[in-house]
Amino acid sequence: MLLPIIAVVIGLVVLVWSADKFVDGAVGVARFCGMSTLLIGMVIVGFGTSAPEMVVSAISAMQDAPELALGNAYGSNIANIALILGVTAVISPVIVVRKALKRDLPVLIAVTVLAVILALDGAIGRIDGIVLLLVFAGVMGFNIISEIRQKHKAGHVEDSEESSKEVSLGKSLLWLLLGLALLVASSRALVWGAVAIARALGVSDLLIGLTIVAVGTSLPELASSIAAARKGEDDLAFGNIIGSNLFNTLAVVGIAATIAPMDSFEASVLSRDMPVMAVLTILLLLFGLPVRKKRIDAGGHRIGRINRIEGTTFLAIYVGYIAFLIAQAM
């Protein structure tokens, strides 16, 4: 029991430090390349912080533990919105830019609906997994192409000399890659220790997947989102959550199902966990709408904001959800 406890403590310390450096690197690369921090938050940060979910779910599928794989993916989505965005908003209200409301959040809602439809038969087969991966490739490709077209349409030209004074690409790449590597390694150590402790206490696989593993593999999102919000990089914090949930719903489940088709899983995943995930995704859109919010962007459009009250609401939902899971398991 001592070794798992040490892994949890060291993993958490390294996780917090590496997340801060990872955000610095991501923002630096985004600015150097002229990309928006929203896009790099969805693609690079979203992928990097979802790497633990991918590894855990793939291994779970190969070890014939579909409940752990699905619990990890969908539990992480629930934790990302209710716990991580909730905590981030309580610490520092999160700005929701117009692009996220018009394009990215509707896509996330559509992807969530697709995941529910594919799971209605109580199985996620290899074809379902391939469909999810193809949709994932399409969504990421569309976002990247849209960003490139928008840059050209606006006639935006980056002054490389001025940009290099503001940020060093080499240094940013170093922090980005080093931070990413340490994020993955520390989260793996943290999850391993937490799972070892939980199993020593006799907790079920599904409960582990939905709670400890889901929260553990979502800690990179928590650390990087808080770090981004405290640095004033709201696009990165919000894009991180959207990107991570897209990765989890499409890539994580898709990879797991393609490697080892899930012929069956507990009915509670479909009747309890996926509806909670869907409701939270819709609330994310509703809370982000710029209704009665006076912030204006450079284009004269109102900006949405997830404030501390809404963040507290998310946290309350998560506490209630976890309490319900524990009550059912007892």
Where are these regions (language model features)?
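Hydrophobic alpha-helical segments, chiefly the membrane-spanning helices
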Residues: 1-330
